[in-house]
């Protein structure tokens, strides 16, 4: 039997057009693709797998974003013998069918194979975003590798929230495969034979402090290797007291930083700190967050205190809805795609 690839370079969830079609984000995507290609060539990778969510906005693609993403895929097309390009949920116009998606045009590029239907060849299965009851097929399937864009229960959607179990697709349905590699959840994580490889680079404060993203290199029948993009933007949350003790060590270039004001300072002092630290450490964003005094007074040592992001709060509230009142899976999907 021939192998589908010798050495493959793999990445996922780049989300061109994120942050209201931010030029900064699209430029980051371009720079990531350049680094990805350079690293793949150093590792002698002839094949590329993209595991889904090329674009972010599923209803409409901004023309400038489209130009950025087209240039990125043209670079990939010129750099690999074959590119297996999975259609993710953010690439689809409809939630429940894959016949209309934002990367249809890519089939005209040399070497690009659009995976908008299940693909099996040479002991490898490639699975796009699953719709309907397609997941039932997995129970009888087996092989060496799966590349996919799966939404499996009990894996982390972000640093704090696990995917609920809706009693449909289960990790055990993939037991017939040696190794499963997936996009969709941005946090790199592994359970048994299933690995979410982590997205291209951090995108928001849900990724704060977690830089294990970038690309995977997989040589056939070998263990995967992971590479982080050295110039990836980073997200951090600190207390002001810690930043003042070690600004050079904590404030990294091209970072997005939130600082909790855990010490008493005036508005003028806060403004001065922000105006000084941002250019001095080449930060992209610096936000100062006041801490309510009544909260800290009632809990002076901050014991048993957990700070939650807006994402965490909303997703927890959706999960707490009464069974049968709403389709919680649909509500979560709608919220994550906003």
Pin down the residues of each PLM region.
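Conserved catalytic scaffold of divalent metal-dependent phosphoesterases
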Residues: 69, 87-172, 197-200
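Accessory, non-catalytic peripheral segments of nucleic-acid enzymes
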Residues: 3, 220-338
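Core catalytic region of metal-dependent phosphoesterases/phosphodiesterases
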Residues: 4-7, 14, 18-119, 173-177
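Structural motif
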Residues: 8-10, 49, 126, 145-149, ...
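Structural alpha-beta junctions
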Residues: 78-80, 110-113, 176-179, 274-291
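Conserved beta-sheet core of the metallophosphoesterase superfamily
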Residues: 159-227
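Active-site environment of divalent metal-dependent phosphoester hydrolases
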Residues: 15-19, 56-59, 86-97, 131-134, ...
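Short, conserved loop/helix-junction motifs that constitute active-site signature segments
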Residues: 76-79, 139-142, 171-176, 250-252
């Amino acid at each position: 039997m021939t192998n589908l690839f010798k050495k493959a370079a793999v990445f996922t969830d780049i989300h061109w057009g994120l942050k209201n079609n931010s030029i900064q984000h699209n430029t980051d995507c371009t720079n990531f693709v350049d680094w990805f290609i350079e690293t793949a060539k150093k590792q002698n990778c002839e094949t590329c797998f993209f595991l889904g969510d090329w674009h972010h906005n599923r209803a409409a693609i901004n023309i400038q974003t489209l130009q950025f993403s087209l240039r990125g895929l043209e670079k990939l097309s010129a750099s690999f013998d074959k590119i297996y390009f999975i259609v993710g949920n953010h690439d689809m116009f409809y939630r429940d069918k894959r016949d209309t998606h934002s990367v249809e045009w890519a089939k005209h590029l040399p070497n690009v194979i659009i995976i908008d239907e299940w693909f099996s060849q040479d002991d490898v299965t490639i699975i796009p975003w699953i719709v309907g009851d397609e997941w039932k097929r997995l129970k009888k399937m087996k092989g060496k590798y799966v590349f996919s864009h799966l939404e499996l229960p009990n894996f982390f959607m972000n640093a704090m929230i696990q995917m609920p179990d809706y009693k449909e697709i289960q990790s055990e349905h993939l037991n017939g495969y040696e190794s499963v590699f997936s996009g969709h959840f941005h946090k790199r994580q592994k359970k048994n034979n299933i690995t979410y490889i982590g997205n291209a680079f951090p995108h928001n404060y849900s990724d704060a402090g977690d830089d294990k993203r970038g690309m995977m290199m997989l040589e056939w029948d070998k263990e995967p290797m992971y590479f982080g993009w050295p110039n990836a933007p980073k997200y951090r949350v600190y207390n002001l007291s810690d930043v003042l003790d070690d600004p050079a060590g904590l404030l990294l270039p091209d970072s997005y930083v939130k600082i909790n004001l855990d010490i008493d300072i005036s508005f003028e002092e806060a403004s001065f700190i922000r105006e000084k630290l941002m250019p001095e450490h080449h930060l992209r964003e610096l936000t100062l967050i006041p801490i309510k005094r009544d909260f800290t007074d009632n809990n002076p040592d901050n014991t048993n205190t957990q700070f939650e992001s807006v994402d965490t709060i909303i997703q927890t509230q959706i999960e707490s809805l009464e069974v049968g009142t709403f389709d919680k899976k649909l509500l979560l999907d709608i919220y994550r795609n906003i």
